[in-house]
Amino acid sequence: DLDEGKSQVAHGETVRETANMISFMADVIGIRDDMYIGKGNKYMHEVVDAVTQGNKDGILEQKPTLVNLQCDIDHPTQAMADMLHIIHEFGGVENLKGKKIAMSWAYSPSYGKPLSVPQGIIGLMTRFGMDVVLAHPEGYEVFPEVEAVAAENAKKSGGSFTKTNNMAEAFKDADIVYPKSWAPFAAMEKRTELYGNGDTEGIKALEKELLAQN
């Protein structure tokens, strides 16, 4: 269990150096980097590129498998586990087409959760011909790039992807309701900036603001 505070990253070690050192000791590397908007997934790709290059250059005898345990864009392991459960409940993947799933924002007593779960769900479920509805209050939008992927997936699979700020509309005739809390997009951007500046007091103030907003 490593983070920037426990590794040599805190002392200026590069992504390439860290990735290669860990790779000497691991067959599988899981990375979770979900709190930095616009940076988490990018960092994971930097690690993948570094390990791939290390293997090509002969530094690493073998290239470990890298697993996205959650980033700012997606939470693939959870989304796939949820999909397997849904497939089981409806008796097979062939029975998913036309089923309506409402991915809905929900209240949570904890502050500012990442956007990756709702984004992972709308990105995956739309690939199976399902009618996917993303429901949330105004200000809780997800990445527009992910919405575009969901819309394109739905078009190809014969399903649909819609957005609404009306929860009753989203839940009407839904076969599945998936409640999940996530932070306002603007707040996630602000938190990324605060973390980057090392502003611990600003982060604490933002946490209080998000709790009140929840």
Task: Give a label for each model feature.
Residues 13-16, 115-120, 194-195:
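Charged helix-capping and loop-helix junction motifs
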Residues 43, 147, 189-191:
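Short amphipathic alpha-helical segments
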Residues 1, 87-180, 185:
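Glycine-rich phosphate/diphosphate-binding loop of Rossmann-like nucleotide-binding domains
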